[in-house]
Amino acid sequence: GFPLGVSTMSSTSLEEVLDQSDGNAWFQLYAGESDALTQGLVSRAAQAGYRTLILTADVPALAPRRRDQHNGFTVPFRLKPKQLIDFCLHPRWSLTTLMRGIPKPRNISVQEGREPSSSETGFRREAGRGRFDWRFLSQLRSQWPHQLVLKGVMSPEDAKMAVTAGVEAVYVSNHGGRQL
């Protein structure tokens, strides 16, 4: 079957998703703002049993997200009149979310066994941007013993360099074109 791609920003922990996928999941890594955070995520993925890691390199800089701006979406979330109207127009979703709690990224907490803090749930969108380079990929390759995929390759030259650096596959992507 097809593997599940599990994002660093997933609202379900990488361990839980792997359990539910019968072991057929790949972990998609966004480089964190610190090496410790990134290495912790890589170690957790390996310990959980992931056999494929996707390093996401197709968002080196953030572009304005016009749709999010138009809809009043902010991180961290702030309640505004437009959102209040949306909640009233979608009562089932609103009540379910209230009962279950606001979805939070479950993979970015560095300490096991605690809820992500409010700053972590906001996950600074600029964190880790521009940190990726070939040295970073080389270090990751030496840390990760299984299949490594580089996501965000846009040129034949970069694809060749990625293979030389030890990745098993390249994933041609511009992140939906919204980061251009």
Predicted regions, residues:
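Active-site entrance/lid segments in N-terminal catalytic domains of soluble metabolic enzymes
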Residues: 1-164, 168-169, 176-179
